Amino acid sequence: MPPQLSNGLNHSAKVVRGTLDSLPQAVRDFVESSAKLCQPDQIHICDGSEEENQQLLSHMEEEGVIKRLKKYDNCWLALTDPRDVARIESKTVIITQEQRDAVPIPRSGLSQLGRWMSPEDFEKAFNARFPGCMKGRTMYVIPFSMGPLGSPLSKIGIELTDSPYVVASMRIMTRMGSAVLDALGAGEFIKGLHSVGCPLPLKKPLVNNWACNPELTLIAHLPDRREIISFGSGYGGNSLLGKKCFALRMASRLAKEEGWLAEHMLILGVTNPEGQKKYFAAAFPSACGKTNLAMMNPTLPGWKVECVGDDIAWMKFDQQGNLRAINPENGFFGVAPGTSVKTNPNAIKTIQSNTIFTNVAETSDGGVYWEGIDQPLAPGIKLTSWKGTEWDPKDGEPCAHPNSRFCTPASQCPIIDPAWEAPEGVPIEGIIFGGRRPAGVPLVYEALSWQHGVFVGAAMRSEATAAAEHKGKVIMHDPFAMRPFFGYNFGKYLAHWLSMAQHPAAKLPKIFHVNWFRKDKDGRFLWPGFGENCRVLAWMFDRVQGKGGARLTPIGYVPEEAALDLRGLEAIRVSELFQVSKEFWEEEADEIHKYLEEQVNADLPYEIQSEVLALKQRISQM
């Protein structure tokens, strides 16, 4: 007779590691009801130990899911099914009773600010996917903490998954294991249920031994029930539920209810030559150099940059009115292509050990390779592409997928900030918005006020390469770099940001906007970027201290020429870098106005509407 789970359900899942008795009652109920539904063969309660990790990695190696990279210490390569390589916005939904709780209702067409699904439609979708979806597989129970264990800003989640790749990655990206269950006790937690959607025996063979079910992929967030439910994809952004699903979509909704902010932002510490230190948070859309800025090697003598986090910030005002931030993650899930000793030497040092690479190319001597790695291959070394075939540059295809990743422990970063795990967080004195803007937008400007700064975040736009090559490059709206990650109505999100100014004793950070990517008429970058960006950080540092010369323009304060330290740089065309053209900004303001009126519509806060009109007025007087 099969063993019975203690709730009397006749279910044959065998607990192969840990015991159900050791789980807090609410966690046990979640595990048992999910096991009854998904019908795994085995249940494995993760303890997070090194021994467990090595066992899982060896098991995946035997199954052909990952390959050991012999050139490095404890590094692994996973190649996915080519249909499962990225987040899928069209299949990522928020479920609420009322559509308007999840997304603003646009004037016409579809909302670009998130996707809503009704509870009724979700129930049908859920019932068509999850019953029996883990047959023949092991259900892993992953207790994890977003943020340092015991920090008042941290939150706990329990993810159930049938993917050992998810377990190994979550051990890097979060604090995971028995200590989390001890800290949880009878406390609240976010529930995550994930399945690759490939019960055994398989109906059709896997590609690259990578389990996924692209036809039925769905990533659903139920904020009222504190649940995340993901089916059909093994890719990180869809399966590591602590990342975007919890840390941004779910957390932004919790933050709204509890009076804090969950943001798509890096956190860095900047120390000047006098030894004074200030922390900044920065929001850039993807492919704008967040990780590179977070791990920068400054070129200015005497300045130091240290990294608290490269992707997500949870921020809350303390009793003294300081905006305190933690990085809720424990690792970096970085885009590999473009990462090199030149662009990001600290990332290259971080990923030499204990790292899981996904969809990069492999060298014949057991190393990794990608576009922009800037290291010539040694004679006789061949490349295997991310598709698992020998790579030839004549094929005209990249050797690594453009969204290929490294998943690596933050503690290995040579410039990790000494306070990166401080339970109280670090005090944020400046917030930076930015995007990739080839024309019209200055290198840096400072917002006129908190309210104007919130408008600057709402107006963020960035160049994205259109999927269809013939379209060329388009400038996309990406407010707060959160467009794919809002957990609730963006109009209400703006009101929440504006409300921070009402916080008693709030020391509101200064808000800045940067653009490293302005080009001249011949298409050449006007600014060298990378380590030279410390010169812009130095000006912001001075501004936060009440120093640093600035002149007023219709869009905000830009540095006076003498205030930006350009020593040692070749012929920088300062006037071109900081030019604010009436013609460009008339068009820009019209486009922003149109977007906010159409997309946010009735939920646009009055204060943001008045900022648009004030900007138009200032431009008209140029």
UniProtKB/Swiss-Prot annotation:
SUPFAM superfamilies: PEP carboxykinase N-terminal domain, PEP carboxykinase-like. It comes from the Eukaryota. One of its GO terms (cellular component) is cytosol. Acetylated. Lysine acetylation by p300/EP300 is increased on high glucose conditions and promotes ubiquitination by UBR5, acetylation is enhanced in the presence of BAG6. Deacetylated by SIRT2. Deacetylated by SIRT1. Ubiquitination by UBR5 leads to proteasomal degradation. Keywords: Acetylation, Cytoplasm, Decarboxylase, Endoplasmic reticulum, Gluconeogenesis, GTP-binding, Kinase, Lyase, Manganese, Metal-binding, Nucleotide-binding, Phosphoprotein, Transferase, Ubl conjugation. It is found in: Cytoplasm, Cytosol; Endoplasmic reticulum. Residues 457-487 are annotated as: Omega-loop. Pathway: Carbohydrate biosynthesis; gluconeogenesis. Mn(2+) binds at residues 244, 264, 311. Binds 1 Mn(2+) ion per subunit. The modification N6-acetyllysine is found at residues 70-71, 91, 473, 521, 594. GTP binds at residues 287-292, 405, 436, 530-533. Phosphoenolpyruvate carboxykinase activity is regulated by acetylation and glucose levels. The anaplerotic conversion of phosphoenolpyruvate to oxaloacetate is improved by PCK1 acetylation on Lys-91 (K91ac), Lys-473 (K473ac) and Lys-521 (K521ac). High glucose concentrations favor PCK1 anaplerotic activity by triggering acetylation on Lys-91 (K91ac). At low glucose levels, SIRT1-mediated deacetylation of Lys-91 promotes the cataplerotic conversion of oxaloacetate to phosphoenolpyruvate. Changing residue 139 to L: Impaired phosphoenolpyruvate carboxykinase activity, leading to reduced intramuscular fat content, enhanced backfat thickness and lower meat quality. The active site is at residue 288. The modification Phosphoserine is found at residues 90, 118, 286. Cytosolic phosphoenolpyruvate carboxykinase that catalyzes the reversible decarboxylation and phosphorylation of oxaloacetate (OAA) and acts as the rate-limiting enzyme in gluconeogenesis. Regulates cataplerosis and anaplerosis, the processes that control the levels of metabolic intermediates in the citric acid cycle. At low glucose levels, it catalyzes the cataplerotic conversion of oxaloacetate to phosphoenolpyruvate (PEP), the rate-limiting step in the metabolic pathway that produces glucose from lactate and other precursors derived from the citric acid cycle. Binds oxysterols in a pocket within their transmembrane domains and interacts with SCAP via transmembrane domains 3 and 4. The KxHxx motif mediates association with the coatomer complex. Belongs to the phosphoenolpyruvate carboxykinase [GTP] family. In eukaryotes there are two isozymes: a cytoplasmic one and a mitochondrial one. This is Phosphoenolpyruvate carboxykinase, cytosolic [GTP].
